């Protein structure tokens, strides 16, 4: 059919029967080429297109809970390395006796000696000895401003007073510091800071130097009274 005749048939200028469209003709189903003989070397059981191939049947017994637990046990079970239960003896070194026959090491029990307190005592020196300037010193730890009267009475009697205000709130501690400063000024004494929230009130006849205040702070004397 010529191109002109196809054009006329497309626009209805000629009968439709005379129009033969090769695109409307249904092609014949392609025939599957014959499978060659099993001489290609392929495994016929691996060819899924083969009619002889069949999927293996699903077996519920293989996935039963008991069977699954058996399979898990095969992989979960692990035998760790075995260690010998025999206990090896450990050599114990005995302490060497010193030249005086005493065993080296710290002494425990009733015979123990607190060397730290001895060092503290040695650092105090004559400052706190009997007859020293601070031999009558007293430490007061007020909990509120109501104890200011006790501090004033001790200081009025000529006793040096250490005020430990650590346990007081900041507001009450500030009020007590103002009271002590005014008290020291009125009685011609001195009012000095020893440590954080710790102060020393000294009467007029007792002069405490800066070095002595430093020694009070180092020895922690105010915390032992």
Swiss-Prot record:
Subcellular location: Cytoplasm
Biased composition, class Basic and acidic residues, residue ranges: 28-54, 77-86
Signal peptide: none
GO CC term, one of those recorded: cytoplasm
Superkingdom in the source lineage: Bacteria
Keyword annotations: Cell cycle, Cell division, Cytoplasm, Septation
Region ranges (Disordered): 22-116
BP-aspect Gene Ontology terms: division septum assembly; FtsZ-dependent cytokinesis
UniProt-listed HAMAP family: SepF (MF_01197)
Entry function: Cell division protein that is part of the divisome complex and is recruited early to the Z-ring. Probably stimulates Z-ring formation, perhaps through the cross-linking of FtsZ protofilaments. Its function overlaps with FtsA.
Family (UniProt): Belongs to the SepF family.
Subunit description: Homodimer. Interacts with FtsZ.
Protein name per the record: Cell division protein SepF
The organism of origin for this protein: Rhodococcus jostii (strain RHA1)
